[in-house]
């Protein structure tokens, strides 16, 4: 439903448009409902199968949301909700769950950050005593070597799912659960 969808284009909060809406299970659930409606409209004979599959998936999304909310929601177990990341792909997590990210790159992870951009991240890591920098699965850890050397942060992975997973056994739910585990580990939170 519309009230469940977050628009991460909130310039007052410093967000540029972030296309990574699937990283918020509630927004992804709303998208699933939209796709279900279109599939039923285009292929009415598949109504029962589409509906059963979508409902099962949306239940899994609800469980995923419960896990993230239990960790990072208003009464979540994680009080340290600030981390560093190489790429600004996480504004939906910020808006939904309050996990904040200081990022080296903006929305384009391929761009080359300036020395001033890197120094801002280093200063913020030191100021907020951030202990982890998250990079994406296909990003080389060496890309953040200077930050690691200057701050001693740990490098962990978050999956943005912009590309197919390197492990063919992974799917959206397994990768989102890995993200939750890595966030909990990296932020030093109780599970």
Residue ranges and their predicted role:
Residues 1-191:
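Extracytoplasmic metal-acquisition and chelation regions
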